[in-house]
Regions:
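ABC ATP-binding cassette signature C-motif
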Residues: 1-148
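Flexible nucleotide-interacting loop at or near the entrance of a catalytic core
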Residues: 14-20, 139-182
Length: 182
């Protein structure tokens, strides 16, 4: 709500001695909104400050899954590095999940263990961060081109055979003639 203070938005009605005694909460507040007055009304903040307050509110929560849309928008490089480190150490190994949509390639490399590319109604999974995704995608594209080249080569041979006219006694199956016409 625009009438809520930054503090109310981030920690709710938790007393200061409770949230301030939690090192994780203190680190999040210091990194993301340390320059924003704790008692400022959210409605008086700039768009970037509001985004950082919202991000702090999410990170303070104890979630098993986080879904973040462009989390690095309105963050400086130091804060982006902090966010990547925080997300990498947020959950114990093998627990927790992060779903992130971003154009920040460095951030993707830092926080992603796997990526999904969505295109033409298809979801292609890739292991690793952005750099690994690029390498794997190039290899998949190369393999797809090789398969298509072989298919086109076979099609050319079949069409050339049909153009010469199949001989009456040739044992070329009818299904191949039909397939070539399709």
């Amino acid at each position: 709500s625009d009438d809520a203070t930054v503090g109310e938005c981030v920690v709710g009605d938790a007393p200061e001695h409770e949230w301030a005694s939690d090192p994780k909460t203190r680190a999040i507040v210091a990194a993301l909104i340390g320059d924003v007055a704790w008692d400022a009304r959210v409605g008086s903040l700039s768009g970037g400050q509001r985004r950082r307050v919202d991000l702090a509110r999410l990170l303070v929560g104890d979630w098993d899954i986080l879904a973040l849309d462009e989390p690095t928008n309105h963050l400086d490089m130091r804060t982006i590095r902090w966010l990547a480190a925080h997300l990498n150490t947020r959950w114990p190994q093998g627990t927790g999940a992060l779903l992130v949509v971003t154009h920040d390639r460095w951030f993707l490399d830092e926080v992603c263990l796997s990526m999904w590319e969505v295109h033409d109604g298809i979801v292609d999974p890739f292991e690793g961060g952005y750099s690994a995704y690029i390498q794997q995608r190039l290899e998949r594209d190369r393999q797809a081109r090789a398969i298509e080249d072989r298919r086109q080569n076979l099609l050319r041979k079949e069409l050339a055979w049909l153009a010469r006219g199949p001989q009456a006694r040739a044992c070329k199956p009818k299904f191949r003639t039909k397939a070539a016409h399709e």
